[in-house]
C-alpha cells in the first residue's frame, strides 16, 4: 500500500481503512469509478490452495467492506511451474455488490503484455 492517510492513526490498518473510506466517498461525490490496487497478505504463501480470497487483502477488512467489486488475478504456473495451465491467468470476481461472482480464464501473452480470450486458441470439438 503506497498511499498514506492524512491524520495520525494508531495502526496501518486504521490508515488503510481511512484511505478506503476516502476513495469510496470520492467515487460517490464525483459519480466516477475508482480503481484501487492492493497487495495480498503473505497468508497465501502458507497454504496449499494459492488462489486469493477476500480475506487475503492486506492490512484491512475495510477494503473488502467498502468495495463494490473485488477482483483477483491468479496464475497457477507462478506456483506450479509444471502445470498444464501455462500462460493461463484466471480473472476471479470475488465480490460484486450488484452482480454474480465467478471467474474467467485468459491467455497471457507476456511479449505483448496482453490478455486474450481462450476461445481464440481452443480447437472446435467435432
Residue positions per predicted region:
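Non-catalytic scaffold segments within catalytic domains of secreted glycoside hydrolases
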Residues: 14-18
Amino acid at each position: 500500500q503506497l498511499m498514506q492517510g492524512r491524520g495520525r492513526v494508531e495502526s496501518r490498518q486504521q490508515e488503510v481503512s481511512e484511505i478506503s473510506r476516502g476513495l469510496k466517498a470520492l467515487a460517490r461525490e464525483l459519480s466516477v469509478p475508482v480503481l484501487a490496487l492492493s497487495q495480498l497478505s503473505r497468508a497465501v504463501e502458507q497454504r496449499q490452495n494459492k488462489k486469493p480470497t477476500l480475506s487475503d487483502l492486506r492490512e484491512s477488512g475495510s477494503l473488502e467492506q467498502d468495495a463494490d467489486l473485488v477482483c483477483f488475478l491468479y496464475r497457477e504456473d507462478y506456483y506450479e511451474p509444471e502445470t498444464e495451465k501455462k500462460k493461463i491467468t484466471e480473472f476471479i470476481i470475488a465480490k460484486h455488490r450488484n452482480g454474480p461472482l465467478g471467474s474467467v480464464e485468459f491467455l497471457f501473452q507476456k511479449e505483448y503484455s496482453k490478455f486474450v480470450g481462450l476461445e481464440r486458441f481452443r480447437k472446435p470439438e467435432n
